[in-house]
Curated annotation (Swiss-Prot):
This is Small ribosomal subunit protein uS3. Keywords: Ribonucleoprotein, Ribosomal protein, RNA-binding, rRNA-binding. Binds the lower part of the 30S subunit head. Binds mRNA in the 70S ribosome, positioning it for translation. Pfam families: KH_2, Ribosomal_S3_C. GO terms for cellular component: cytosolic small ribosomal subunit. Belongs to the universal ribosomal protein uS3 family. It comes from the Bacteria. Gene3D superfamilies: 3.30.300.20, Ribosomal protein S3, C-terminal domain (3.30.1140.32). Residues 39-107 form the KH type-2 domain.
Amino acid sequence: MGQKVNPIGLRLGINRTADSRWYADSADFGRLLHEDISIRKAIREKLKQAGISKIIIERPHKKCLITIHTARPGLVIGKKGGDIEVLRKELAKMTSDEVRVNLVEIRKPEIDATLIADDIARQLERRASFRRAMKRSIQSAMRLGAEGVKVVVSGRLGGAEIARTEKYAEGSVPLHTLRADIDYGTAEATTTYGIIGVKVWVYKGEILEHDPMAQDKRLETSGQSRARANTNQRGPASGAQAAGA
């Protein structure tokens, strides 16, 4: 079972928590869910070069707190904070709540599954060898502390007439072990031959305590620090309840 399902979804409530952290009644749930989808899509399209890993959305009373995990916070903030203020105003048009934007800097993008997948996809779009791209990314992740990495690419690889799937892995990736800290990311490479899908699994060790926020705490203590980028007055975020949308 662990080989088939999304490893993040499988571990929700054990050592992971959802990226949408709010509660809503049935009358508002659909609207808020579509707002979340639109916000994430807009951020990823506008900040393609910023190395966006994940976007966390919390909704305390009448507020929308957006936390962007990025490898290049300076690119998001812009000169004197101008770019992030423009982004905040654009996002505010998508929701009726007050929008605040925070940034978290990713100190080691080489072991972030989403960023690895994006990097491989960009290399494939530049006609790089898929084997070389996979091997280089895996070796870089292993060198910087990952205990295991698996990469799968699927499509018309190298312009072949028949689509196929290729896999490459190093180290251990125990997908059945629920206490394992496994990061998972996907990306698509748009080539002249069609779309090539990229999937990446990164194993970073075990989380022994039963705590849905364990991975977030571990990221903060292992080198990922919060970058200041609150574009409005600072307000308490403790009203957000952890829940999955």
